[in-house]
Regions:
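Sec-dependent N-terminal signal peptides
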Residues: 4-13
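Carbohydrate-active catalytic/glycan-binding domains of CAZyme proteins
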Residues: 20-343
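Short, solvent-exposed loop/linker segments at the N-terminal edge
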Residues: 349-354, 455-461
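Asparagine-centered strand-capping/turn motif at beta-strand->loop junctions
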Residues: 468-472
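Short acidic/proline- and small/hydrophobic-mixed sequence motifs that coincide with surface turns
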Residues: 473-479
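Intrinsically disordered, low-complexity Pro/Gly/Ser/Thr-rich segments with frequent PxxP/GP/PP motifs
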Residues: 488-515
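Terminal connector regions
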Residues: 513-545
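Conserved small/polar residues in nucleotide/adenosyl-binding loops
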Residues: 638-643
Length: 643
């Protein structure tokens, strides 16, 4: 065992710059994307600021605006986001730690959440007080006005942004028989139309809470991120008046992806990079070349559109940021092109037989579509067409009050029955980029979301019981449900209409279905004979006592060896499929007496807190293929470990 930890510790300290960068090959089609296709095209020049000499940083960031975001010589800042109060002031909740800390940047796990205030959205922000200990905060406001500041492994809550008293608490999570991918860290939140909250965890799972504080229920059984190679982290989700948006970063490839969704569960990925190093540029074209851009957060306008993105940035590899040196980190603000407000006026669904499409461009303060838009430059349709310069072309315009209606020839729109927000790209008469997404009048933007738990065998009734809940915001459509067990399917059963959050249990005969705890189940939903959803709830979970034993065992190892960083690395590798380790760990497991179960569960809960904190920031570690192979091949055994 000591040899194992020696291997981990040795590989841990071999981290290099090369190990933190991998050149990801872009799809060939991305070479043909037009301006406005990529999310990163929306970044605008940073507002003019103050530049001074004698500051920390590599040569590539000495041209920075020191009054942008938040920066202090003696503090290293990292992730955070901004809320606005009713008086118009901006409140940044950001984490940081002393720059002269013995571990340098690696002191992040002891960071403090600061509350900083500014009269300007871009800063400079000045610290008013501290909220408490914690890392990677994300603040959001509940329906009743209270403010929640999430941090890894918990949250702080207060009556308002200016509160001097913050109460610490912990969220409750129900995985609903689904595997939790990469633990529950770096959570990001978006308020839904009914003031409930949607949450995306670091691993790409989607969760929903009725009010933001009540238990978060997991809906997805796999990550919702793009189906491409990548080491994903730093998700940020938000919702505007039309749709949900999600950006996730591949920290190893230093490329981020942009996704959109009608319901927050089913996502489409747009082509092109969401951001890459170098998106922080000035009006004169000068670039602040930060080594890493992480923990993106957005500030939204009254329509929910992202108008600014904040990043945690550092001028070098994290391991090279040492105490009392020339390196450090800060949080910066970059303005965004918020896009136009668009709506399709066609009442009937757009099909291949549709001849014209009418799109209204709404007037706003500082934007007159009747005089500002270069109509000939506009293209409209599915992002799969418009992002490449294709799509519908305008044929005429009409005036509607202060708004402009553009009539497009429908040919080439690329719009299908799955479309929920067609895209427009063009230019204004000064050559500046215009873009926007249009509301379709026939689309339900508050759909039902049916989700099943793992089927359970009911011995008394001799069948399989399936619990189904509607997590959507509308009543469900007529639906039939089918259960597939180890490849064998059962007859479909009609599901009654479920109101939002309503639960219904269906009973299936067990003639064709197995009741084995290790059986593989799928629950399939059909509407009008067409499959609309397929759930794959995981295998039956081990008992709380077995889980407690596992976590307690690892907790003892952690306390004994005290190799926090190396141990964190090990946990991350094991977490890819933890349940596969249970049989090995339990080979020497002896049934514990009931009276000590409570104590074991208590210890396990304490370790889960350590575990969640430790798996965060995994991008700091180099790959160790040899050790991973040793674990997977069984060369490194865990069966000899006992309490």
């Amino acid at each position: 065992m000591k040899k194992l930890f020696f291997l981990i510790a040795a590989s841990f300290f071999l981290t290099s710059v090369d190990a933190q960068i991998t050149e990801r090959e872009r799809p060939a089609e991305w070479q043909h994307l037009v301006k406005g296709a990529r999310f990163m095209d929306r970044f605008l020049p940073m507002p003019d600021g103050i530049q001074i000499k004698g500051i920390w940083g590599t040569d590539s960031v000495l041209n920075r605006y020191v009054d942008n975001g938040i920066e202090l010589p003696g503090v290293s800042f990292w992730g955070g986001n901004i809320l606005q109060d009713t008086d118009g002031k901006y409140h940044l909740f950001v984490c940081g730690w002393p720059e002269d800390s013995p571990k340098g940047h690696m002191f992040w796990s002891n960071s403090t959440v600061f509350h900083a205030v500014s009269d300007r959205l871009e800063g400079p922000f000045k610290i008013q007080n501290s909220v408490g200990k914690g890392h990677n905060p994300e603040a959001f406001q509940l329906k009743d006005g209270r403010v929640v500041v999430y941090v890894i492994d918990g949250y702080y809550i207060a009556d308002g942004v200016d509160s001097k008293v913050w109460t610490y608490g912990k969220f409750s999570f129900d995985s609903r028989d689904r595997k939790i991918i990469e633990g529950l860290s770096n959570l990001t939140f978006a308020r839904r139309q009914d003031d409930s909250y949607l949450m995306v965890c670091r691993g790409g799972g989607v969760w929903i809470s009725k009010d933001g504080l009540s238990p978060y229920m997991q809906l997805t059984d796999k990550r919702v991120y793009p189906d491409v190679e990548g080491r994903f982290e730093d998700p940020v989700v938000w919702r505007d008046e039309l749709q949900y948006h999600l950006i996730v970063n591949d920290w190893l490839g230093r490329i981020a992806f942009y996704q959109r969704s009608k319901d927050g569960v089913h996502w489409v990925t747009e082509q092109g990079e969401a951001y890459v190093p170098g998106v922080s540029f000035h009006k004169d074209g000068a670039v602040e070349h930060w080594f890493k851009y992480e923990r993106p957060k957005v500030f939204q306008d009254e329509k929910g559109r992202a108008v600014q993105m904040n990043f945690a940035v550092i001028d070098t590899i994290k391991w090279n940021d040492l105490p009392n040196d020339k390196h450090s980190s800060k949080n910066i603000s970059i303005p965004l092109n918020k896009g136009m407000l668009l709506s399709v006026l066609n009442e009937e669904e757009i099909t291949p037989s549709t001849r014209t499409i009418e799109v209204k461009i709404a007037a706003e303060s500082g934007f007159n579509p009747q005089t500002d838009v270069d109509v000939k430059s506009l293209r409209f349709g599915s992002f799969t067409e418009v992002n490449f310069g294709r799509g519908c072309k305008p044929v005429k315009t009409k005036v509607s009050g202060k708004d402009l209606i553009v009539v497009f020839k429908a040919k080439g729109s690329g719009i299908t029955s799955d479309e929920f927000a067609p895209k427009m790209i063009g230019k204004d008469k000064k050559g500046n980029m215009l873009y926007g997404y249009a509301r379709l009048p026939y689309v339900n933007y508050r759909p039902a979301l049916l989700s099943a738990r793992r089927p359970l065998f009911d011995k008394e009734k001799g069948g399989l019981k399936v619990e189904i809940q509607n997590f959507g915001l509308s009543a469900s459509e007529p639906t039939e449900v089918e259960v597939i067990c180890n490849g064998s399917s059962q007859r479909r059963i009609a599901l009654k209409t479920l109101q939002p959050y309503e639960i219904e249990c269906l009973m299936f005969d067990s003639d064709m279905l197995l009741s084995d705890d290790n059986a593989s189940y799928e629950v399939v939903f059909f509407q009008e004979g067409k499959e609309v959803e397929r759930n794959k709830p995981g295998n039956k979970q081990l008992s709380d006592m077995q889980k407690a034993y596992f976590f307690d065992l690892l907790s003892d190892l952690f306390n004994f060896y005290s190799l926090e960083q190396a141990y964190k690395r090990l946990l991350r590798m094991l977490d890819e499929d933890l349940y596969k380790l249970y049989p090995k760990l339990l080979t020497e497991y002896k049934l514990l007496e009931p009276h000590i179960k409570e104590k074991i569960v208590e210890v396990a809960h304490r370790f889960r807190n350590q575990y969640t904190r430790l798996i965060n920031e995994s991008e700091d570690y180099a790959s160790d293929q040899e050790l991973q192979e040793r674990i997977r091949s069984g060369a490194v055994s865990y069966t000899h470990l006992t309490l």
